[in-house]
């Protein structure tokens, strides 16, 4: 079964691509998870502007209302993924080859969960 974040991703991702944006992450935050935060990035490598976030924030609620996914949410926040954007999809690792990254693992690897280094290769095994 998909999480609500995955369901929202499935519903809005194509619309964001049509608008020229990549959906980076959907997450709930705030007290009782009443705030839906959507992080976006530009598909054409330009910086995401405040106007871009406003445009997306006016489009997404209509899509979510039709699908009836976040009826209990009190607000929707759209923001640029920024300089410290999370690398969520495999394609992100190839896009950022050669860049310095901080990685946080869910499980211990060699007695650590945090690593820092440069992405030199990305393989999907």
UniProtKB/Swiss-Prot annotation:
The UniProt record lists the keyword Cytoplasm: yes
Top-level taxon in the UniProt lineage: Bacteria
UniProt-annotated location(s): Cytoplasm
Main location: cytoplasm
One annotated GO biological process: ribosomal small subunit assembly
Alphabetically ordered keywords of this record: Cytoplasm, Ribosome biogenesis
Gene3D superfamilies (alphabetical): RimP-like superfamily, N-terminal
GO CC, any one term: cytosol
Protein family per UniProt: Belongs to the RimP family.
Function: Required for maturation of 30S ribosomal subunits.
Protein name: Ribosome maturation factor RimP
Upper taxonomic lineage: Bacteria, Pseudomonadati, Pseudomonadota, Alphaproteobacteria, Rickettsiales
């Amino acid at each position: 079964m998909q999480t609500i974040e995955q369901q929202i991703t499935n519903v809005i991702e194509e619309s964001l691509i049509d608008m020229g944006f990549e959906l980076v992450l959907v997450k709930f935050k705030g007290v009782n998870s009443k705030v839906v935060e959507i992080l976006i990035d530009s598909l054409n490598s330009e910086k995401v502007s405040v106007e871009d976030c406003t445009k997306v924030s006016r489009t997404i609620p209509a899509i979510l209302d039709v699908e009836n996914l976040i009826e209990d949410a009190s607000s929707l926040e759209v923001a640029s993924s920024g300089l410290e954007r999370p690398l969520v999809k495999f394609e992100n690792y190839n896009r950022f080859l050669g860049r310095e990254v901080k990685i946080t693992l869910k499980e211990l690897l060699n007695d650590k969960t945090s690593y820092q280094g440069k992405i030199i290769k990305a393989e999907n095994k």
